[in-house]
Curated annotation (Swiss-Prot):
Type II interferon produced by immune cells such as T-cells and NK cells that plays crucial roles in antimicrobial, antiviral, and antitumor responses by activating effector immune cells and enhancing antigen presentation. Primarily signals through the JAK-STAT pathway after interaction with its receptor IFNGR1 to affect gene regulation. Upon IFNG binding, IFNGR1 intracellular domain opens out to allow association of downstream signaling components JAK2, JAK1 and STAT1, leading to STAT1 activation, nuclear translocation and transcription of IFNG-regulated genes. The gene is IFNG. Belongs to the type II (or gamma) interferon family. Glycans are attached at residues 39, 106. It comes from Moschus berezovskii (Chinese forest musk deer). PANTHER family: INTERFERON GAMMA. Keywords: Antiviral defense, Cytokine, Glycoprotein, Growth regulation, Pyrrolidone carboxylic acid, Secreted, Signal. The modification Pyrrolidone carboxylic acid is found at residue 24. Released primarily from activated T lymphocytes. It comes from the Eukaryota. Homodimer. Interacts with IFNGR1 (via extracellular domain); this interaction promotes IFNGR1 dimerization. This is Interferon gamma.
């Protein structure tokens, strides 16, 4: 388990480090603390390749990239939750979480609460599964791009108008 944690901490360091603001954010020192704590600079951490970086490279468009980033941020929030009682790294994790919160959720506490609610939902609960399936059609409709939805409604209205006039 510790090896996995070390590897994940290294990935966090790399992800945040290569995000374009390496060394400029308040999290730089805290990432170094986590790297030391998890021994994430050890060469064996690189075994198997990167965890997230290759995936991030595959997603070019900003809106698409946000989808992947949300999953990655969710992962790190869960990782930090697993170590919440570890006083040695608590300050570092809090600072990094706050920086992620500012960057990813634009500092919106409402968005943060919603995000936390989503990552806490247990998928093995039957009642949750039933609710999720019940809401699936609405969720799928919400996934449709808004412009396509308007185009489809417009073309349906045109088609109906032609049918009525013949």
């Amino acid at each position: 388990m510790k090896y996995t944690s070390y590897f994940l901490a290294l990935q966090l360091c790399l992800l945040l480090g290569f995000s374009g603001s390496y060394g400029q954010g308040p999290f730089f020192k805290e990432i170094e603390n986590l790297k030391e704590y998890f021994n994430a600079s050890n060469p064996d951490v690189a075994t198997g390749g990167p965890l997230f970086l290759e995936i991030l490279k595959n997603w070019k468009e900003e809106s698409d990239k946000k989808i992947i980033q949300s999953q990655i941020v969710s992962f790190y929030f869960k990782l930090f939750e697993n170590f919440k009682d570890d006083q040695v790294i608590q300050r570092s994790m809090d600072i990094i979480k706050q920086d992620m919160f500012q960057k990813f959720l634009n500092g919106s506490s409402e968005k943060l609460e919603d995000f936390k609610k989503l990552i806490q939902i247990p998928v093995d609960d039957l009642q949750i599964q039933r609710k999720a399936i019940n809401e699936l059609i609405k969720v799928m409709n919400d996934l449709l791009p808004k412009s396509n939805l308007r185009k489809r409604k417009r073309s349906q209205n045109l088609f109906r108008g032609r049918r009525a006039s013949t």
